[in-house]
Amino acid sequence: KDLEPPRPMAQKIKTILISQPKPSTEKSPYFDLAEKLKLTIDFRPFIHVEGMEGQEFRQQRVDLAQHSAVILTSRLAVDHYFRIAKEMRFEVPDSMKYFCISESTAYYLQKYVQYRKRKIFHGTIKFDEVVALMKKHKNETFLLPCSDLLKSSIPNALDAGGFNYTK
């Protein structure tokens, strides 16, 4: 027993860092946990996506009117697509089709369009499922709003499927 090194005392956790934005309502389980365990919770989003300016988008010579479908991979993509459309004074037509990576992204579209009226298709998180839905609409011209750091699997899947798309 004399040869054993002394054991360090366990330290009590006082602060937790959560890598997402602070919830807008006080009904979040994080606040309940903080109150129950007497913790301090810091909310810091680690990923910050800055939208492209309308002028910068125009310089890329992408014509929104030439696209009949949009591939949306996140809620941020939805927000930035409609912000750019508004900046460019482009009225999104009723015939526009939306291909969303998940059901939650599809429901988020309700913020901008009437869900029943438009043609909205969604997968369940896997992009391959979205590609399978897109194969039924192969004659569409797709727009893929994305960041500079896009997974290579998404353009690879679109190229393999032979889709006409613009990033």
Q: Which functions belong to the PLM regions below?
A:
Residues 1-8:
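N-terminal amphipathic/basic-hydrophobic helices that include classical n-h-c signal peptides
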Residues 9-167:
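Conserved beta-alpha
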